[in-house]
């Protein structure tokens, strides 16, 4: 980790630290600190927790409960986790509230060792009167010491009731509870929503869960360092590129609070440290510092960003931009102008619509403004809070009434059925009327508009200009073809020109039941042509600027590429201003569905190697087979498709970029790709080379081996990123410990060793240390040979080369990056040929789509 902090920051804090609680400005009217199951007061982080059985203002309503005490030795730093209250039936804590308004609800859980209860098997559901806080939370992947959950809810009555609901054949437990008043002005009722940028009101009616609270550049701050008892974590593990930042510090006592930003907003220790742009030797001034935060994609998020200019020596010298999920949240931000000084805190709130983030990742970035004299950007703190959904839940879609057994929801069941029936009948009548009207309007439009007229306003031209002649042709596959004509370029390999009516018939008028996927450019449907051929139809969305750009890029790439391991194209349709590409249908879909997330039989080790080899051949052809290399930029398991014989093809060229020419070493370009697969050097320098694809392919290799996503936010933090996690095991020589359990005892150790070495080389931090795709292909084929040959005969030692007798390849040392790979056995290395084109149509393909926000 390239930080200038570590010991210096710790020494700095020790030299200037004073306990902030001594100068607390806010005294919470309600301040319940409850130690559940304890028989005496417990001191934790300089705060006193009172036993739940002795608190005078607390009413504990329980059915069957008991106390669990840890059988391990007592640890004073985690003393509240030595006991727990265990419930086998519905139970509740009732708190008397003296001051209405927002309150923190903090829950502490630790499945302590106990001879009576197996708390690791507990399933926890916690609700208030109005909101679901936790729903069937389990400890299946738990390997830490405790779990801490923090919520804020607006209490509008004299009492706050927390109900704990065990699931069937399980128990629920809790170690400690905090219910603490929140300052009235800490969370506003309105914030700016992004994409589209509009005010979002009504926050006071919603509940929040703290997902992240980060101290940029500084150490962990516990409740002892915060006047409101909050915890601020160090941000290092969420930086997309650790070496992209330089930490700057100031004396906490020099921070100048204002009436609008007080000690309650954030401690001065947060504003006294900052991450700034490090000297990363970037080629582009648009380089950003980015934090990647795994989130639940089904919720909105309240994002608060904290700033304080402790960097500048003079006013108006630091101007930068803030981005949330690639949306410009703040442009040309000059902190000294906004605060009328230096070292004056400032914060801004936003609402991010997480429901469109299918990747489950929220990103926050800062970068220099294009007009700034100094290339720099900074951030001091970041808070991300999950917002309750329409069901008033922070965990799933179930409401409180549906979770409480025998609650008020069941009492009004008959009434709800009657009302629902009436509403349904009225809705059905209105729906029929609307459908009739829409059909009438559509019929009139179809009669009044000819297909030829629709062609006059094409927003796109699916005809790459490669100096080839254009010829007008008609589709002859249907009798409907005589009604229209369209432009076709057979010589550009765009294939057959389809009539729009043919597409409509093939997809049953784009029936939603035929939907295969959704992407930034539009949708992909499964269809069947008149001759019975199954196809995948990609229909572009003309309102999506990103989609149109990716759509054109894919057309341009596919028109000049033909290879057995690249997606092939049947034809297109540009009638009626449509943007439609037609591919042959890929029977076995994306590689990812065969690894996890789908109920499919596990792939054997040999099958996995053959699939990786096929994908490597496709990428090697992209890099070396065309007149100018092509960089895919979005290599991942959803973009590797499998035909009925599990032959792999690389798909989705929407982000592809022509590589550097012979006199160039790289292409400077804005960073695009998918988090988890993105080359850190490309992200840091914005210099794109073929080695960026190699890095992404290394992630794919680890994904194939371990059968888990590239990013998995539900795992412990050190396991979230598969590249970092798997590399740690590979360097210890223990890669077999984390591979898919279906492969245990079924993999030749020599083959696994070569596979791991190949992936490790691909995931090198710097591109110069990574192999070419040709070298990767060579080594994967070697791993396959080792799998097919006796381990005793083929066991490689540390000094072995990658020469395999019997394979027609030029002998070379493994990963010799000084060599230019021109030809390999079994790899088509020339430019696209008719033979290649014929080969490319032997298996069915379609381009797997992912949501563009995940890129």
Curated annotation (Swiss-Prot):
Residues 822-855 are annotated as: Disordered. Residues 510-783 form the Protein kinase domain. It is a single-pass type I membrane protein. GO terms for molecular function: ATP binding; protein kinase activity; protein serine/threonine kinase activity. Glycans are attached at residues 41, 64, 75, 114, 118, 136, 143, 154, 168, 225, 242, 288, 353, 376. It is found in: Cell membrane. Belongs to the protein kinase superfamily. Ser/Thr protein kinase family. This is Receptor-like protein kinase THESEUS 1. The gene is THE1.
């Amino acid at each position: 980790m390239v930080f200038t902090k570590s010991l210096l920051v710790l020494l700095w804090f020790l030299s200037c630290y004073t306990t902030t609680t001594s100068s607390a400005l806010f005294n919470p009217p309600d301040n319940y600190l409850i130690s559940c199951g304890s028989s005496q007061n417990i001191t934790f982080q300089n705060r006193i927790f009172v036993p739940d059985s002795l608190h005078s203002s607390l009413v504990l309503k329980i059915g069957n409960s008991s106390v669990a005490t840890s059988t391990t030795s007592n640890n004073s730093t985690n003393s509240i986790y030595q006991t727990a209250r265990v419930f086998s039936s519905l139970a509740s804590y009732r708190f008397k509230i003296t001051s209405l308004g927002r309150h923190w609800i903090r829950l502490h859980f630790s499945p302590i060792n106990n001879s009576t209860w197996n708390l690791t098997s507990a399933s926890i559901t916690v609700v208030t009167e109005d909101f679901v806080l936790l729903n069937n939370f389990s400890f299946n992947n738990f390997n830490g010491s405790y779990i801490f959950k923090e919520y804020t809810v607006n209490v509008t009555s004299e009492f706050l009731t927390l109900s704990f609901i065990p699931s069937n054949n399980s128990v629920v437990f809790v170690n400690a509870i905090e219910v603490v008043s929140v300052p009235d002005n800490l969370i506003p009722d309105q914030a700016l929503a992004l994409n589209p940028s509009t005010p979002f009101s009504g926050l006071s009616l919603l509940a929040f869960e703290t997902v992240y609270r980060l101290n940029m550049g500084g150490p962990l701050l516990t409740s002892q360092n915060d006047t409101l008892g909050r915890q601020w974590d160090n941000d290092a593990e969420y930086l997309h590129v650790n070496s992209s930042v330089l930490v700057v510090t100031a004396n906490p006592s020099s921070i100048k609070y204002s009436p609008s930003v007080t000690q309650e907003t954030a401690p001065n220790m947060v504003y006294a440290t900052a991450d700034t742009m490090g000297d990363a030797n970037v080629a582009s001034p648009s380089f950003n510092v980015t934090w990647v935060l795994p989130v639940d994609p089904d919720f909105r998020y309240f994002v608060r960003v904290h700033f304080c200019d402790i960097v500048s020596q003079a006013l108006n010298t630091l101007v930068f931009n803030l981005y949330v999920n690639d949306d410009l949240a703040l442009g040309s931000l000059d902190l000294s102008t906004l605060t009328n000084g230096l070292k004056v805190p400032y914060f801004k709130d936003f609402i991010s619509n997480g429901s469109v983030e299918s990747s489950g990742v929220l990103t926050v970035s800062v970068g220099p403004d294009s007009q700034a004299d100094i290339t720099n950007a900074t951030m001091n703190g970041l808070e991300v809070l999950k917002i309750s959904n329409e069901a008033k839940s922070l965990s799933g879609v179930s409401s409180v009434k549906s979770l409480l057994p025998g609650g008020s929801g069941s009492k009004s069941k008959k009434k709800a059925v009657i009302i629902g029936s009436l509403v349904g009948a009225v809705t059905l009548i209105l729906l029929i009327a609307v459908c009739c009207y829409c059909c009438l309007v559509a019929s009139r439009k179809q009669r009044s508009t000819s297909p030829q007229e629709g062609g006059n306003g094409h927003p796109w031209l699916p005809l790459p200009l490669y100096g080839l002649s254009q010829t007008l042709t008609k589709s002859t596959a249907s009798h409907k073809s005589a009604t229209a004509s369209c432009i076709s370029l057979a010589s550009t390999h765009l294939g057959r020109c389809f009539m729009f009516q043919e597409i409509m018939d093939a997809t049953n008028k784009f029936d939603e039941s035929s939907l295969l996927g959704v992407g930034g450019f539009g949708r992909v449907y499964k269809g069947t042509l008149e001759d019975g051929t199954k196809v995948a139809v990609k229909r572009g969305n003309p309102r999506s600027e990103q989609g149109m750009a990716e759509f054109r890029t894919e057309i341009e790439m596919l028109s000049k590429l033909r290879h057995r391991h690249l997606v092939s194209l049947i034809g297109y349709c540009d009638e009626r201003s449509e943007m439609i590409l037609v591919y042959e249908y890929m029977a076995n879909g994306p590689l990812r569905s065969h690894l996890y997330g789908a109920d499919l039989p596990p792939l054997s080790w040999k099958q996995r190697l053959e699939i990786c080899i096929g994908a490597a051949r496709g990428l090697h052809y992209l890099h070396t087979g065309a007149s100018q290399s092509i960089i895919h930029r979005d290599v991942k398991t959803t973009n590797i498709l499998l035909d009925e014989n599990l032959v792999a093809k690389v798909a989705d060229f929407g982000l592809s970029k022509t590589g550097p020419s012979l006199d160039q070493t790289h292409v400077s370009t804005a960073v695009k790709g998918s988090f988890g697969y993105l080359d850190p050097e490309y992200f840091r320098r914005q210099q794109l080379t073929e080695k960026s694809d190699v890095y992404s392919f290394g992630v794919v290799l680890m994904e194939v081996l371990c059968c888990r996503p590239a990013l998995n936010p539900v795992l412990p933090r050190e396991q979230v990123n598969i590249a970092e996690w798997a590399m740690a095991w590979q360097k210890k020589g223990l890669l077999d410990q984390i591979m898919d359990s279906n492969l245990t005892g079924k993999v030749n150790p020599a083959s696994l060793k070569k596979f791991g070495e190949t992936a490790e080389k691909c995931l090198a931090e710097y591109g110069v240390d990574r192999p070419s795709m040709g070298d990767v292909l060579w080594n994967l084929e070697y791993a396959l040979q080792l799998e097919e040959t006796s381990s005793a005969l083929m066991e490689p030692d540390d000094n072995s080369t990658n020469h395999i007798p019997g394979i027609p390849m030029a002998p070379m040392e493994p990963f010799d990056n000084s060599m230019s790979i021109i030809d390999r056995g079994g790899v088509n290395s020339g430019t696209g040929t008719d033979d290649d084109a014929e080969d490319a149509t032997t298996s069915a393909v379609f381009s797997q789509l992912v949501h563009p926000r995940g890129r």
